[in-house]
From Swiss-Prot:
Its main location: cytoplasm. It comes from Cereibacter sphaeroides (strain ATCC 17025 / ATH 2.4.3) (Rhodobacter sphaeroides). One of its GO terms (molecular function) is translation elongation factor activity. One of its GO terms (cellular component) is cytoplasm. Associates with the EF-Tu.GDP complex and induces the exchange of GDP to GTP. It remains bound to the aminoacyl-tRNA.EF-Tu.GTP complex up to the GTP hydrolysis stage on the ribosome. It comes from the Bacteria. This is Elongation factor Ts. It is found in: Cytoplasm. The gene is tsf. Residues 79-82 are annotated as: Involved in Mg(2+) ion dislocation from EF-Tu.
Length: 298
């Protein structure tokens, strides 16, 4: 398979690898982007990406809590200028409040909002502002108590990253602190049991290959039993601790894990939602010359 400059650019942007390393990785894996990432990681040339794709879309995430229920809603726009528009922000706030009464995004589109459906309100706002918008997704969570946090807030309950944390037990403020922690660390899952088994096995394969190659290149190679019983399990333990909420060191007090902090506060974390604007979306771009030509032609 021919390796293009665009493929090299994409791999470099997703891994931080150098140009020649990225090109070699793609060549070695016949252009398979996912395999190329793993190849770079076995060579110690790239870190694991927590989420595929770059965040390039604009818009806002809205969060709302009512009793023991919390919701997060993402609405995308074409430009950040519209995301700062008061009418757009009011609309997203309305959608978020409406989401408290439904369970999925399709039901939300059909939900009533001031005598009109959410979908109708969206289309009318598009017509007024003159820019395309999308009600992309919603998430709902419940518990004895739910805390919400918005990072980079544009207005009350609106921002680029929205987090919800549901807990069992009387919340004394720890849930809000954990929500702030989640915004900063972006854990993949609540616990090891919640991680995608395919992801875990892929990580194990990467760490196994990396350990074997490092050992083969060592002046004093270790026995295979040490690799299998000590080194690989140790690396997997670190991976799980770094990527599961309960296993992470608590940002506010790194001497304890999040699980320990919750236990000390007398609560059990039931689940969380972390929603970032444009997660997994890559906005189509035009080069500057094409953009100027398009403007002049218009």
């Amino acid at each position: 398979m021919a390796i293009t400059a665009q493929m090299v650019k994409e791999l470099r942007e997703s891994t931080g690898a150098g140009m020649m390393d990225a090109k070699k990785a793609l060549t070695e894996t016949d252009g398979d982007m996912e395999a190329a990432v793993d190849w770079l990681r076995t060579k110690g040339l790239a870190k694991a990406a927590k989420k595929a794709g770059r965040t390039a879309a604009e818009g806002l995430v809205g969060v709302a809590v009512s009793g023991g229920t919390g919701v997060a809603v993402e609405v995308n726009s074409e430009t950040d200028f519209v995301a700062k528009n008061a009418d757009f922000q009011t609309m997203v706030t309305g959608f978020t409040q409406a989401a408290l009464s439904v369970d999925d995004v399709e039901a939300l589109k059909a939900a009533d909002m001031g005598g009109k459906t959410v979908e109708t309100t969206l289309q009318e706002t598009i017509a007024v502002i003159g820019e395309n918008m999308t009600l992309r997704r919603m998430a709902k969570i419940s518990g004895d108590s739910v805390a919400a946090y918005v990072h980079n807030a544009a207005a009350d309950g609106l921002g680029k990253i929205g987090v919800l944390v549901a807990v069992k037990g009387a919340d004394n403020g720890i849930a809000k602190q954990i929500a702030m922690h989640i915004a900063a660390t972006s854990p993949m899952a609540l616990s090891e049991a919640d991680l995608d088994p395919t992801l875990v096995e892929r990580e194990r394969a990467v760490q196994t290959q990396k350990a074997l190659e490092e050992n083969a290149a060592s002046a004093k190679p270790k026995p295979d039993s040490v690799i299998e019983n000590n080194i690989i399990p140790g690396r997997m333990k670190k991976f799980l601790e770094e990527n599961t909420l309960l296993g992470q060191k608590f940002v506010i007090n790194p001497d304890v894990t999040v699980a320990e902090a919750a236990k000390q506060a007398g609560v059990e974390i039931l689940g969380f939602v972390r929603m970032a604007v444009g997660e997994g979306i890559e906005k189509e771009k035009e080069d500057f010359a094409a953009e100027v030509a398009k403007t002049l032609a218009g």
